[in-house]
Structures are given as C-alpha cells and as structure tokens.
Curated annotation (Swiss-Prot):
GO terms for biological process: fusion of virus membrane with host endosome membrane; symbiont entry into host cell; symbiont-mediated perturbation of host process; virion attachment to host cell. Residues 36-314, 485-1067 are lumenal. The keyword Membrane applies. Belongs to the tospovirus envelope glycoprotein family. This is Envelopment polyprotein. The record marks S484, K485 as: Cleavage. Residues 437-484 are annotated as: Signal for signal peptide peptidase. The gene is GP. A motif (Cell attachment site) lies at residues 41-43. The keyword Glycosyltransferase does not apply. InterPro entries: Bunya_G1 (IPR005167), M_poly_TospoV (IPR014414).
Length: 1135
C-alpha cells in the first residue's frame, strides 16, 4: 500500500514538472533576453582575415538610418518580443500598451542612467584633460556616457586617476595637425552627431543623443583682449575678457602644457620670466595668440635705466663679466692678504679642509716630482720666474738641493723613517698637509670659498544676443524668448515677438507694453517658422541659423562669447558654441573654425634680413654686355646664408648695396593623402541574445550594421542556459562593436608623388626688397637678374611612391606603413577619415577576435579582444626624417627644410651702365604711386609698393621724415619701375613726401607723395609702443660677435672679391697671413729692443762735440772707439 502511494506521488510530481517546464519553455520561446557586455582593451593580438568577403573597402558607402534606442525598466516591462526595431533618427519612441492607444515619450524624459553612476555598476574608460568617458551597466545593458564633472564617479572601476574636478575653461578641437604643436592645451572627449551606420546612443552630461565618441586635441576658445603692454621691468601684459571664465597660458611650440592652463575672470596681469623672453614662447588667451618678442632682459634693463649714458649702458650690459673680474681682483689682493695674515689662528680650519681633501693632497705630493715646470727641492710650480721660494716642501727653513734627499716625499731611499708608517697614519697626515704645495692649495680653496660667498651676495644686474525690437531677446542656449532682465533660461517665453510682412510687434508678458516697428528682417529667407522664437531667429539670423537652432540645440549658450577675434558669422558662432559644448556636427566646419588663428604666433618676419651678420664683399663686374655691367655671383645653397655686395665704378660717386639672403633651403614634396590612423582609446559594444533560433533569428531584432558585426550560435545547451531557458543547441548572440579613437595622437598617411629642391631667396638693396621661390626645375628671371639652382644629389630617405606619416608633433616619419585597403600587419591600422570614421575594417568579427562565456544558469557575456584591425603600436618602428617641423598645404604638399648645403645658387645680375654715371639733369618722375599697409611702432612695419615712370636710368638715394627704410638706395631704370619697400615709422606717413636724391645730389632731388596708408595695429605683444626696442636692437647689431669678426676681415674685401665663391675663405687666409706677419715683425722688434737694453746702447751715445775736443773727450765717452777713416784737414795753405 505504501509503495503504491509512493508511486502515485512520483507520477504526480513528474506530470507537474513536465507541465511547468512546458509552460516556461513556451513562454521563453517568445521572450528575448538581454545579455551583459564586458569590454577589455589593451595590447591585444590581432587576427587578420584576408578573405575578400570580410573586408569593407568604404564604410561611408554603407548608409543606414540611425538607431535610437534608450532602454529603460519601463520599456523592458512593456516591450513585446518584436519591439526591438530600427528607428529612422526619431527622438520620440512609441511604447505599446495593452490598450489600442499609442503613448509617446521624449528621450530626454526617460530615466538617465549616466547620472545614477554612483548606484550602478560603472567603469571609467578614459580620462581627458577636460572631461571623462565612462560606461554604466543597468539590467544587463551598457550605456556610454561623457561628463564634464567627476562628481558621483568615485566608486567606479579605474577611478584612481580621476581628478576631483575638471577645468571649465572653454575649448574647441584642433583638427589641423600643423597647429597642434602650437596651440594644444590638452585633450577632450567629443561626440560626433551623425546619421551614419557607426553611431550609437550616448549621453553627454545629462543630454542623450546619437553619435560616436572620439578623443580630440583642443585649444582655448573665447574673447580675450590684450589691453596693455609694459616691456620695462617688470615685463607684464594685461588681458581682459567679457566671459565668466577664460583661460590663458604661456606655451612653447611642442611643449606639453596639458595641466598648465590658468583660468581667470574679468582681467588678469601676466608677468613674463626671463625664460619666456627667448622669442620661442607664445601667449595663448582664448581665441587670441601673441608671440612674445625675444628680449634680452639684462640688456633691456640697462638701456632703460641708463638711457642717457652709453658708458653706463655698456657697463650694465656687461656687468656679468665685470662682476667676475671684480671677484678675481678681490681674491687676488684683499682676500689673499687676509688669508695670509690668518693662517696661524685658523690652523683648525686648514686641518679640517686638509682632512677632507687628504687623498687629493697625498696624490699631488707623491706625483709632484714627475710634474714638469717644478722645483724639485721646493715643490712649487715654476713657469715664468723659474725661481724657488725660500721654504722647502718639507718645511726646511732654507731651500737647498740637499733637502731633496732628506724629504721623504722626494727621497729615493727605501729605508727612510717614514716608510715604517702607513699612508693613513698621523705622521704622514701632518707631513702631507704641512708641505708648501698642500698649504698653498688649501689657502687657494679658502680664497675661492670666500670669493663665492661674496659673489652670491652681489646683484645680478645693474639696472551676442538677438533683439526683437526693444526688450525681447533670443539668447543662444535658451529655447525661449527672454526679457532684458534675463539671468537664467526660464521654463517658458517671457515675451512675444510677432513678425509680419510689414511690421514687427513686440509684447512683454505681465505688462501692458506693446511696441510696433518696421520689418527690417534679413531679406530672401524662405523657410517655415511658426513659433514666436523661430520667427525672431529667421528674421534676425536667417534660415541657416534657424535650421541649426531646431536640429542642433545648444546645451550651454555661452552668451558672453562673440567670436569677434575670429570674425565669425552668426552661424559660425553657433557652431563654435556647439564645439564648446563638446558636440562636433561637421568635420569640415570644425576644421574651418579651429583653423582660424587670431594673432601673430604663427607669423614670421618675412622682411627681416640680418645684414649685421652677413659678410660684405666688393663686387667686380665680369663683362659689359649690351651696355650693361654683368656680375656673376655664386653662393652655397645653404639656409641662413647670404652676402652684402658693394657695387662701384670709377665714374660713380657712391657705392651701391646689393644684398642676397637665402632665407631657407629645402625640398618641396607633392603628396597624395591616403588615410588617417589613430590608437583605439576604448570600445563600445552592443549585442542581443535569443534563447532559441539562430543568427537569422537574432538579426531580426539586432540588424546588421555593415561592419564589425558578430554572431555566435548556438548559445543554449546543457550547462549553458539562462534562467527559464531550456533550449538545446539553439540560440544566438549577435551585435556589433565600435571603437573610440584617440585623434589627439593621430597620424596622416601620404604617398610621395614628386620632390623638388626649393630655395627662398630675398633680394634687397638697389632693386628694392623682394623674396622669391627658386626651384631646381625652372630658373627665376626678371628684368635685372637671373637665378638658377645647381642641385647636388640629395638622399633624405624619402623616395617617390613611398608612404610617409605626418605625426601630431608635425614631424615626418617613414618606415613600414600599410597601404590603403591592405590588411598587412604593419603600422597604419585602423584606417580612418579625418573625423575618425573607419574606411577600411573587418566586415564581421571572427572567433579569435572575441571570447564568449556563460554560466550554468545566468546571463551570457562576451569579451571583445579586437574590434577591427589595430597596428598603431608599431609606430615605434617608424623613423623621424627631420628635426624641423613641417606644415602641409591643402593636404597636397609640404616643405621640408634642410640644414645642410644642397648645391649652388648662381645669380647673373645685369645692371645698366648708366647707374654708375652721374645724372646729367633732374629726372622726370611721373605716374607716381606709393601705397603702404601695416602698423606703426612695431616690428612688422609698413609694407609699401612704390611705382613710377622715369625718363632716365640712374641710381638714387631715398628718404622720408620720421621713418627708417629697409633700403636707402634704388636702381631706377628708364620706363616703368616697381619696388617693395618696408618702412618703420614713428608717425603716420600719409600724405607726406618721399625724396629721391639721384646719385646723392640734393640739387636735382625729386619728391614722391605717399598716396595711401592703411594702418592696422595688430593686437599683440610685439606691436605695442616700445621706445626702447630700437635701442636694444641697435645695441645687439653693433655688439654682435659676427659683426665684429666681419669688421676685422673687411680690409681684405677688395682682394678677395676677385676669387668669387671663395670670397670669405680668401679673407680668412689673408687675415691669418697678416697676423703671422705682424707677429714676425713684432718678434724682430722685440729682439732688437732686448739687445738694445741688454747692451746698454742708450748709454753709448752723447752729444757730438767740436772736432778739436773730440780726440780728447772720445776716450772718456766711449769704449773701443773706431779710428778715423781720413786724416785731419790741413789749412796751412790758407795762411
């Protein structure tokens, strides 16, 4: 009976279990389950699939609508198995309930999991200078988040390097590699909003959107004005900004200043240190950039303090040398006297110093007898006098040669008494320390220490809103109309603006004020605008701006930012503010805005020719051709070189100056852009799991994206089941992965098409001032001279067809680089567009690219090892071509400067012979024009173009009041003349007259009126009123070591000018020969003088007496008197 009841119970339990399992299995067949995502990044292995069907040549060609899915607990409860669908970029998500009515909610109304990171599982994926990228998991779903605040993220994984707060200084991305080394102030995560196939849901701060995340290099942004410059000690600059917060810093190109940006509000004063005045640093403040001029602080301080005395200026400037001379004199006289007088009272000091330096003293004393120029019995150094002092090395009272045998140090006897003691004994210590040699050394050390103490105490130097009519406004960043009392964005409109065809009506809510005005809107704006604020934006800003307002909202309006320094339009300003909000809408527009540079930090002084360091040469003409003097000039093709030629003729009165300066020499490369590559900073993964079915079943809910997709099947079998899923050998997990690229470290890959040697040559002097590009392919030619390059073979490591990389440091690299669409395992993957969109990657991931795991009962997990190709780590194998940074021109060419000679520059100058003749009459100058553009009292000066017609060929001097000129002499030819002249003026030369003096003759002078002067005072540090800058420059020019060296060689210019390109070499040879000749004659003169003094010849001469007394007095005056050569004269015949 008991057995039957037991069997009955077993059958009932079995039937109940089967029924329950069937119900659960039937329920789970129609219900999908979500899985947890796990992401691992690092130096992971790549597995390449060379099959054609696994490669995506162009990702941009695969267009797909945006997927906008924000999964919440509400949706998971109410969503049916068929509701995971593809949306067409909509921001409204339908929620299907049991009723027939459809409910819609906004994405922004859904719960924000990113803001609840402290209570959810989260992981920090990347930390930039200005924000953080992290991922949050909720109910098995991973959410990507970017935040400008670190609040609430302390408990997240990998939060050790998370700062307590991020800087709020406004920044925008830098997309041009050439500008990164100049303006980079760190990195920031940006969201690229797009409708391409590679987007995914992201939340920036509290604003959900769709797009991709990338890490970009950033620069400062904002309105900043340099209001004052005081380049006298202290060297300060005052800056102001109308924005609530602004950033500035001092940056040297290429320097890492990621965490050195200083924020300020209102105004700030910057004091430059001496290191910042080296001419290599720039001041970056918002949109503005200013080059800090090279200033010798020591020279400038002395010039300012002693501006009325050149002698005091010289003493102050060279005080660093004078103070050393003063210390040397102090050591040699009073300090030495003091040390000699206190040797006995300070015996403990000398014993202490001797104890510290005992090994050195022992070594010197023992090796003293092997030293040259020494006195063996005294131990003193004898170079000049060759005389020994009276004190012996072993402290004998008098010096004697016998002392050498008695002194243990100099003695050669082996059985000396001191040999019984060790070198470390007290006997040897007293002997060594008290020798004359040791004692002199200890006193010298004491003198140096006292001198250093005195030296340390000596001074180092001697010396936009949009208005309806009156009180109703649109403020960027606020979607409602506000009044003039606007403080923060309200929840609804505070006023009303009605734009009609012929008038505009404005009314302020809560008041009885209604204002009417004429319709003065922007014309030809054809777009629909229904709400009041849309009508106002269309009226004042246009349809393009309205489209941005509707589709690209501003989360932070930055109402104080105007973008005036960059000259931004209303649309450009809106886009710049979007960039400040961390959103990139268009790469091309971002590249345009970030490429705008306000200031002179990238400018170079194009007209500056360092004449003070250039050698001078008298130029002799080679021949006369068609009435012209032909000069053949040949110079080494080396950047920074040049020569000042002085042209002269017997018939001319003054020499003509002709300057050739080779500004730079290098190779111009034409290239073809291939792609951009960058490291993978992190990875975003999304996948979906089904209990039954296969990949096709899974893809109905998780559609293919076109690249980097994956699917694993089967995923349901014994030992690998989720709760309430009992399927066997069924199920699938499908999804996709997307990379977050670090564009801050991106490289652009180019293919070399052509290389040409190019020289930038500047000509100044009688031909005016001009700089020209001369290539090895086409000679340069104008009316007066021809230039040609004779190039040597150059091997710079770059060949035609080779792939090169342009790095974020603006340097060029070569090596093993993968070609476009080539999956070879070399540097060059991932392959991207400029804005970080993949253009070649894997279509589907293979099993080796990821790992899949599950539990007996639980959710499945996937680990992504490699999301596409990644070989960026092979960049260490690249070789840097040059130490000089390069700039690309329209991504099609660049110039690589060389620091060595690339050949010869040959110039043929044909000057009319009339230039060397005195003008017979006053020349007729007609059709004159002199137009200038530039700044006053600045380093750039006024760039002027002088044009006129002349009836004569002549040479003329030029001058103008209150201005100094880049050249003071011009070669005028008959007919049309045009010259480029730079003028540095202290006052506006407009409507003044420039005077021409033919052959320097004021009697036949001609005046040319200055027609037009456009003064553009740039707002930077260099172009401020600085009355001492010219004095400093003049002093530096006059005191240049190169200028002094050239002055010494100048007497030999005439002879050396006959040797052409060997001009400078011949001058050095002649100078050395002259020095040896002078030394030879001086040695002869010295020998004669020594003999004269030694023989006392000055005592052998006396006043010549009468002939009658000479015989008597001669023996008393001279020794060895010579006999007379003729007898005395006989006068007897006269008697």
């Amino acid at each position: 009976m008991r057995i039957l009841k037991l069997l009955e119970l077993v059958v009932k339990v079995s039937l109940f279990t089967i029924a329950l399992s069937s119900v659960l299995l039937a329920f789970l067949i129609f219900r999908a389950t979500d899985a947890k995502v796990e992401i691992i990044r690092g130096d992971h292995p790549e597995v390449y699939d060379d099959s054609a069907e696994n490669e995506v040549p162009t990702a941009a060609s695969i267009q797909r609508k945006a997927i906008l899915e924000t999964l919440t607990n509400l949706m998971l409860e109410s969503q049916t198995p068929g509701t995971r669908q593809i949306r067409e970029g909509e921001s409204i998500i339908p929620i299907f309930a049991e009723s027939n009515t459809q409910k819609t909610i906004s994405v922004s109304d859904l719960p924000n999991n990113c803001l609840n990171a402290s209570s959810l599982k989260c992981e920090i994926k990347g930390v930039s200078t200005y924000n953080v990228y992290y991922q949050v998991e909720n109910n098995g779903v991973i959410y990507s988040c970017v935040s400008d605040s670190a609040e609430g993220l302390e408990k997240c994984d990998n939060s050790l390097n998370l700062p307590k707060r991020f800087s709020k200084v406004p920044v925008i991305p830098i997309t041009k590699l050439d500008n990164k080394r100049h303006f980079s102030v760190g990195t920031k995560f940006f969201i690229s909003e797009s409708l391409t196939q590679d987007n995914y849901p992201i939340t920036y701060n509290s604003y959900p959107t769709n797009g991709t995340v990338s890490l970009q290099t950033v620069k400062l942004s904002g309105d900043c004005k340099i209001t004052k410059s005081n380049f006298a000690n202290p060297y300060t600059v005052s800056i102001t900004s109308p924005e609530k917060i602004m950033g500035y810093l001092i940056k040297k190109p290429g320097e890492n200043v990621e965490h050195k940006v200083i924020s300020f509000s209102g105004s700030a004063s910057i004091t430059f240190t001496e290191e910042m005045l080296d001419g290599e640093h720039n001041l970056l403040c918002g949109d503005k950039s200013a080059k800090i001029p090279k200033t010798n602080k020591r020279v400038r301080d002395c010039i300012i303090k002693y501006s009325k005395s050149i002698y005091k200026q010289t003493a102050g400037i060279n005080f660093s040398w004078i103070r050393l001379i003063l210390i040397a004199l102090l050591i040699y006289f009073p300090i030495r006297w003091l040390v000699n007088k206190t040797t006995k009272p300070l015996f403990l000091w000398y014993d202490l110093i001797g104890l510290i330096t005992y090994p050195i003293l022992l070594l010197i004393n023992c090796l003293w007898k092997y030293f040259p120029f020494k006195c063996s019995n005294c131990g003193n150094l004898c170079i000049i006098t060759h005389e020994c002092t009276k004190i012996c090395i072993c402290n004998k009272s008098k010096a004697s040669k016998e002392h050498s045998s008695e002194c243990p140090i100099l003695s050669k006897e082996t059985d000396h008494g001191y040999n019984k003691h060790k070198w470390t004994s007290m006997e040897w210590f007293h002997l060594i320390v008290n020798t004359k040699l040791s004692f002199s050394l200890l006193k010298f050390v004491t003198e140096i220490l006292i001198g250093l103490i005195i030296l340390s105490q000596m001074p180092m130097s001697m010396a936009q809103t949009t208005q309806c009519l009156s009180g109703c406004f649109y403020v960027p960043g606020c979607p409602f109309l506000v009044t003039s009392k606007f403080e923060k964005c309200p929840e609804k409109d505070q006023c009303y603006c009605n734009v009609k065809e012929d008038k505009i009506i404005e009314s302020i809510f809560g008041t009885n004020i209604v204002i009417e005005g004429p319709n003065d809107c922007i014309e030809n704006q054809n777009c629909a605008a229904h709400p009041s604020i849309d009508n106002l934006i269309k009226c004042r800003l246009g349809c393009e701006y309205l489209d941005l307002f509707r589709n690209k909202p501003l989360y932070n309006g930055f109402s104080d930012y105007t973008g005036s320094s960059l000259g931004l339009t209303s649309v450009g300003l809106y886009e710049a503010k979007r960039l400040r909000n961390g959103i990139i809408d268009s790469y091309n527009r971002t590249d345009k805005i970030s490429g705008m540079i306000a200031g002179d930090s990238l400018n170079k002084n194009e007209t500056s020719i360092p004449e003070n360091i250039l050698p001078r040469q008298s130029l002799i003409f080679d021949s006369v051709v068609d009435g012209k003097y032909r000069y053949m000039i040949e110079q080494s093709l080396l950047g920074g070189g040049g020569t000042i030629f002085m042209l002269n003729d017997k018939t001319s009165e003054t020499a003509k100056k002709f300057v050739i300066y080779i500004k730079s020499v290098g190779i111009h490369y034409e290239v073809s852009e291939k792609y951009t590559t960058a490291p993978i900073q992190s990875t975003h993964t999304d996948f979906y799991s089904t209990c039954t079915g296969n990949c096709d079943t899974c893809r109905k809910n998780q559609a293919l994206t076109g690249f980097q997709d994956f699917c694993i099947t089967p995923t349901s079998y014994w030992g690998c089941e989720e709760a309430w899923c009992f399927a066997i050998n069924e199920g699938a997990t499908c999804g996709f992965c997307r990379n977050i690229y670090d564009m801050d470290k991106s490289y652009r890959i180019y293919s070399v098409l052509k290389s040409t040697i190019v020289a930038d040559v500047c000509i100044s002097g009688i031909l005016g001032g001009q700089c020209s590009k001369i290539t090895e392919e086409v000679p340069y030619e104008n009316a007066l001279f021809q230039a040609d390059i004779q190039a040597d073979l150059h091997n710079d490591g770059i060949t035609i067809g080779e792939l090169i990389a342009h790095g974020p440091d603006s340097h060029i690299y070569s090596g093993n680089i993968a070609n476009l669409n080539d999956p070879v395992k070399m540097f060059g993957h991932p392959q991207l567009t400029h804005d970080g969109v993949p253009i070649f990657t894997k279509k589907t991931l293979e099993g080796d690219d990821m790992s899949w795991d599950c539990a007996a009962i639980g959710k499945k997990s996937i680990t992504i090892k490699t999301c596409g190709y990644d070989t960026y780590r092979f960049r260490s194998g690249l070789e840097q071509i040059s130490d000089i940074p390069v700039s690309f021109k329209d991504f099609s060419s660049f110039f690589l400067e060389k620091a060595f000679s690339l050949g010869k520059l040959k110039i043929v100058v044909d000057l009319p012979s009339d230039l060397f003749k005195v003008a017979p009459k006053r020349p007729s100058i007609t059709s004159t024009s002199l137009n200038c553009n530039g700044c006053l009292l600045c380093g750039q000066g006024l760039s002027c173009i002088l044009e006129f017609f002349s009836d004569l060929t002549f040479s003329t001097a030029i001058s103008i009041d209150a201005c100094s000129l880049s050249t003071y002499q011009l070669a005028v030819k008959k007919g049309s003349n045009k010259y480029n002249i730079t003028m540095f003026c202290s006052a506006n030369p407009d409507k003044k007259k420039m005077t021409l003096y033919p052959e320097g003759n004021p009697d036949i002078s001609v005046e040319v009126l200055v027609n037009n002067v456009i003064v553009e005072e740039p707002e930077n540090i260099i172009d401020q009123n600085d009355e001492y800058a010219h004095e400093e420059q003049q002093y530096n020019s006059d005191s240049s070591a190169w200028g002094f060296w050239d002055y010494i060689k100048s007497p030999f210019n005439f002879i050396a000018s006959y040797f052409g390109s060997f001009f400078d070499t011949i001058r050095v040879i002649l100078l050395i020969a002259f020095i040896f000749l002078v030394i030879y004659f001086c040695s002869i003169l010295t020998t004669i003088c020594k003999g004269y003094v030694k023989n006392e010849s000055y005592k052998s001469r006396s006043k010549i007496e009468d002939d009658d007394d000479s015989e008597i007095k001669a023996p008393m005056l001279m020794k060895d008197t010579m006999t007379r050569r003729r007898p005395p004269m006989d006068f007897s015949h006269l008697v």
